[in-house]
C-alpha cells in the first residue's frame, strides 16, 4: 500500500505554503496525543462550497477533507457548534443521533461536494464498469456499493455506483482518492 507516498492524495489546495503550515503544525504536536474526533485548525478553509456560510449559521461543525471544508455534524445553534477532543463518546453523539432519527422518520439531504464523482456514458459503459468493479452493477434508477480491486484482488476503492440510464453511470467515492481512482479507470480503458 503506497497511498502515503502517492502525491495524487493532495490536490491543488496543497501549495508549498500549505505544506509548510501543516508540517509545522504536525511537528509542534509530535508528542501530543491525537484524538479520533480532533481536527487540526491550521491550513483550513482552502476550499468552501456555496453553502458554507449557511451551514455555519445553522450550527455546523466543520471538518476538512482534501482541502474542502465539509459538515461533520450540526449542533442546535452556532454557539454550540464545537467539538471537544476525547477518546470517549464525543459531544457530537446526541446531535448525530437526532440527525439520524430525523432522516429515518422524515427526510434528509446530504451535500456530496467532498465526494469524488466519475461519469461514464456510452454503449460500452456497463461493460467497462463490469470489468473494473467487483460488485454487481445496478439497474437503471438504482444504486449499489461496489469495490474496485487491484489485479491481485486488494481493495483499491470503495465506490457507490448510480445507474442513471442503461448506458449512463455516476460513480461516487472518496474525494481524497479521486485522482488515484481516475488513474485506475484510465489504466483499464
Name each region found by the language model.
Residues 2-189:
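Glycine/proline-enriched, intrinsically flexible loops and inter-domain linkers
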Amino acid at each position: 500500500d503506497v497511498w502515503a507516498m502517492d502525491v495524487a492524495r493532495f490536490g491543488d489546495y496543497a501549495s508549498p505554503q500549505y505544506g509548510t503550515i501543516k508540517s509545522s503544525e504536525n511537528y509542534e504536536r509530535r508528542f501530543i496525543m491525537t484524538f479520533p474526533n480532533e481536527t487540526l485548525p491550521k491550513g483550513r478553509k482552502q476550499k468552501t462550497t456555496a453553502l458554507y456560510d449557511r451551514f455555519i449559521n445553522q450550527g455546523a461543525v466543520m471538518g476538512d477533507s482534501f482541502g474542502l471544508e465539509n459538515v461533520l455534524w450540526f449542533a442546535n445553534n452556532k454557539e454550540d457548534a464545537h467539538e471537544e477532543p476525547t477518546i470517549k463518546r464525543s459531544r457530537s453523539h446526541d446531535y448525530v443521533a437526532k440527525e439520524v432519527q430525523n432522516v429515518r422518520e422524515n427526510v434528509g439531504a446530504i451535500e456530496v461536494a467532498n465526494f469524488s464523482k466519475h461519469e461514464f456514458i456510452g454503449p460500452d459503459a456497463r461493460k467497462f464498469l463490469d470489468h473494473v468493479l467487483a460488485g454487481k452493477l445496478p439497474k437503471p434508477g438504482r444504486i449499489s456499493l461496489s469495490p474496485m480491486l487491484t489485479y491481485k484482488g486488494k481493495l483499491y476503492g470503495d465506490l457507490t455506483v448510480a445507474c442513471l440510464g442503461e448506458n449512463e453511470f455516476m460513480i461516487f467515492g472518496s474525494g481524497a482518492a479521486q485522482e488515484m481512482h481516475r488513474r485506475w479507470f484510465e489504466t483499464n480503458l
